[in-house]
């Protein structure tokens, strides 16, 4: 076991103290079927010595029964937990694993590569800071590679590590790696991700995963784990204060506090705040936590605020700074991932739940549907399981939100079926209908007609319909 594991076994309090101040990175592994996602995670855990002896013994036993490789020890079984996954050698569920290095703590989400499990991937990626896109060196950039990359971009992941896996299968050929790197960079011009890094690896053999590879001395960069340890994610934090009230704490007549997790920004005792939707203002009297009162609190902290004035605040309300208010609207546009077998019904009433706030609402129109394999937009009058589309929403009570690209915590929501209480969709807000209408490009009648003429007579030019941009 590693030093951390030894410390965990001998002095739990010291282990917790050491790890308390480490920053946390959540990352997702995704790629085509059988690209080696589970094997990669198994290799990270194995080579960083984060596996206990009893777990090792169980995996060695299971390897004899389910082994999908030629090795005596199947690393993918460290992650593939479902019986059907082990029998088929694939990942179906979203599997989470936890480990830590001297620099940082990690939560890994291993997601399915199959298209029919797109909703599982969306679930796993929704809270991640970084994505590892695995590409099989034998096949290069595939359709599923594009699909997973697009979904990561859609969900606001700002850091990508493209791991070209199974380099051992192509004799560690540098030319193969360079071609895949060039192909992906060309494709990635369509993505809204600025930080993309590349590393050639062999998860099965351990090359460039935790330790540097002796077989790829031509690669000048860092192994995968070193990249994960050094990529800076703290710059992604939004500095506008947002606190969604989860409940009002009233243990006695002398105390009234508003509990929730700080979604973004920072708050201090004495700061002026505004409650939404009432618009009432007050000042922070105290910030109470499990460890006692604090002078300030920041994103990610679970706190209870007490105020100097008695103002009306209840569950589902939002506390902000008066000069940094979010958008408030009953009409908004959002990218919607449909997550159930029954198709989306336009104008049907669903429960719209954003944080702790719930209201009734419906999709009043579908702007377009996105082919996640090609990223092309097309017309649609419904969305079915695993499809993604841009939709116009109308809700009964105004939502207080930021654009998802600016704040993932306050720009996301889920849709719940009123009859079954099942979660049927997940949405990422693009903005209010009014705001987006102001920024939409306006084309003259001549431009629209000319565009239609070009598309009709010169289809090989692949000109896009400007009315749908």
Swiss-Prot record:
Keyword Cytoplasm: no
Enzyme class, UniProt record, top EC level: transferase
Gene3D superfamilies: P-loop containing nucleotide triphosphate hydrolases (3.40.50.300), Translation factors (2.40.30.10)
EC number(s) given by UniProt: 2.7.7.4
Annotated region described as G3, given as residue ranges: 110-113
Function of the protein: With CysD forms the ATP sulfurylase (ATPS) that catalyzes the adenylation of sulfate producing adenosine 5'-phosphosulfate (APS) and diphosphate, the first enzymatic step in sulfur assimilation pathway. APS synthesis involves the formation of a high-energy phosphoric-sulfuric acid anhydride bond driven by GTP hydrolysis by CysN coupled to ATP hydrolysis by CysD.
UniProt xrefs under PANTHER family: TRANSLATION FACTOR
HAMAP family cross-referenced by the UniProt entry: Sulf_adenylyltr_sub1
Record's protein name: Sulfate adenylyltransferase subunit 1
Lineage, highest ranks first: Bacteria, Pseudomonadati, Pseudomonadota, Gammaproteobacteria, Alteromonadales
Name of encoding gene: cysN
């Amino acid at each position: 076991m590693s030093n951390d594991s030894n410390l965990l076994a001998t002095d739990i309090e010291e282990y917790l103290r050491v790890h308390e101040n480490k920053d946390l990175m959540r990352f997702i592994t995704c790629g085509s079927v059988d690209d080696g996602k589970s094997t990669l995670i198994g290799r990270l855990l194995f080579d960083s010595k984060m596996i206990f002896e009893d777990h090792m013994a169980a995996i060695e036993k299971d390897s004899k029964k389910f082994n999908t490789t030629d090795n005596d020890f199947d690393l993918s079984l460290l992650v593939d937990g479902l019986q059907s996954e082990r029998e088929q050698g694939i990942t179906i569920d979203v599997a989470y694993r936890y480990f830590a290095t001297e620099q940082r703590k990690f939560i890994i989400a291993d997601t399915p590569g199959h298209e029919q499990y797109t909703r599982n991937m969306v679930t796993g990626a929704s809270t991640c800071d970084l994505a590892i896109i695995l590409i099989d060196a034998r096949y290069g950039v595939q359709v599923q590679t594009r699909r997973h990359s697009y979904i990561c971009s859609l969900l606001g992941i700002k850091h990508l590590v493209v791991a070209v896996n199974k380099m051992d299968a192509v004799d560690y050929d540098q030319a193969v790696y360079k071609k895949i790197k060039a192909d992906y960079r060309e494709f990635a011009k369509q993505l809204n991700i600025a930080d993309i890094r590349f590393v050639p690896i062999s998860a099965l053999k351990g090359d460039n995963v935790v330790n540097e590879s002796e077989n790829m001395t031509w690669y000048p960069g860092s192994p995968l784990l070193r990249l994960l340890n050094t990529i800076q994610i703290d710059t992604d934090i939004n500095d506008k204060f947002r606190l969604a009230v989860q409940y009002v704490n009233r243990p006695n007549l002398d105390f009234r506090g508003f509990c929730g997790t700080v979604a973004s920004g920072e708050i201090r005792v004495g700061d002026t705040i505004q409650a939404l939707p009432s618009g009432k203002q007050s000042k922070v009297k105290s910030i109470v936590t499990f460890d006692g009162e604090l002078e300030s609190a920041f994103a990610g902290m679970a706190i209870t605020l007490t105020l100097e004035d008695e103002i009306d605040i209840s569950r589902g309300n939002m506390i902000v700074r008066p000069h940094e208010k979010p958008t408030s609207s009953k009409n908004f546009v959002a990218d919607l991932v449909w997550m159930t077998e029954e198709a989306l019904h336009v104008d049907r009433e669903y429960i719209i739940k954003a944080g702790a706030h719930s209201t009734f609402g419906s999709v009043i129109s579908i702007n377009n549907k996105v082919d996640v394999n090609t990223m092309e937009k097309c017309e649609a009058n419904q969305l079915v399981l695993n499809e993604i589309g841009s939709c116009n929403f109308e809700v009964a009570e105004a939502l207080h939100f930021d654009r998802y690209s600016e704040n993932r915590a306050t720009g996301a929501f889920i849709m719940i079926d009123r009859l079954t209480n099942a979660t049927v969709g997940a949405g990422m807000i693009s903005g209010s209908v009014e705001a987006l209408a102001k920024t939409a490009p306006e084309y003259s009648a001549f431009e629209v007609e000319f565009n239609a003429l070009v598309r009709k007579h010169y289809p090989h030019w692949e000109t896009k319909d400007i009315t749908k941009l």
